[in-house]
């Protein structure tokens, strides 16, 4: 597995924060690094396989990656990321107690993926741009300024996370997308889902199309197909079983949609003919 080292990304040995844009981020094989990072998805879509579990990421997704986590990117489509790298929560010169603002693992579950709405994403970009402008300066005031900006970033993300901000339709749509990530195999009635998340059906369609570039049903189908592709690569279950587990009631229909989406059949993927990056 590829290991990325801090010496290749941080501007100096005492720098606590570094900015690494990926505009765009291409498919990248599984790797880990000797530093932590906050991945901010600017726009586009892709699959982020995090410790073996696939997540669909779109504009507004924020991923918290620790130094022992392994992850990869696949099926990227104009996926643009900004990575905010930091050595460790306890390796800051002027800050302490940062762990309290970061996601915490509880009973083996780590909430690695958050979502923020468009207005918050704009504020995030401004903070990151300020950090980036100061990267070449190593005097104490500049170091303190970068660390303060990093603290502001964590506070903004914390306050704006789904757990704490559901007061507008953009935030409710983000919650709906997170719900689909966990319930993709269920039979989805869009009228009921819209009501569940206090959205009109028209607003749901419009905002989901704006955020993902896809209609709701197209987004759900792609999500199911991507989950199925992951299982084809990483499990021994039969194609039929995987189709059912991913919400398809007809394995033949599943195979047709799968080939249309990926230009490979499920059997091709199972046999590794697509040259997937391991």
From Swiss-Prot:
CDD domains assigned: cupin_RhaR_RhaS-like_N
Gene3D superfamilies referenced in this protein's UniProt entry, alphabetically: Homeodomain-like (1.10.10.60), Jelly Rolls (2.60.120.10)
GO biological process: positive regulation of DNA-templated transcription; rhamnose metabolic process
Key words, A-Z: Activator, Cytoplasm, DNA-binding, Repeat, Rhamnose metabolism, Transcription, Transcription regulation
Cellular location(s): Cytoplasm
GO cellular component term, pick one: cytoplasm
KW Transcription (keyword) present: yes
A Gene Ontology molecular function term of the record: DNA-binding transcription factor activity
Principal location class: cytoplasm
Residues annotated as domain HTH araC/xylS-type: 174-272
Site positions per UniProt: Interaction with sigma-70: 241, 250
The keyword Disulfide bond is annotated on this UniProt entry: no
Membrane-traversing stretches: none
Matching SMART domains: HTH_ARAC
DNA-binding region: 191-212, 239-262
PANTHER family: HTH-TYPE TRANSCRIPTIONAL ACTIVATOR RHAS (PTHR46796:SF13), HTH-TYPE TRANSCRIPTIONAL ACTIVATOR RHAS-RELATED (PTHR46796)
Subunit structure as annotated in this protein's UniProt entry: Binds DNA as a dimer.
Its job: Activates expression of the rhaBAD and rhaT operons.
NCBIfam families hit by this protein: PRK13503.1
Protein name: HTH-type transcriptional activator RhaS
Species name: Escherichia coli (strain SE11)
Gene: rhaS
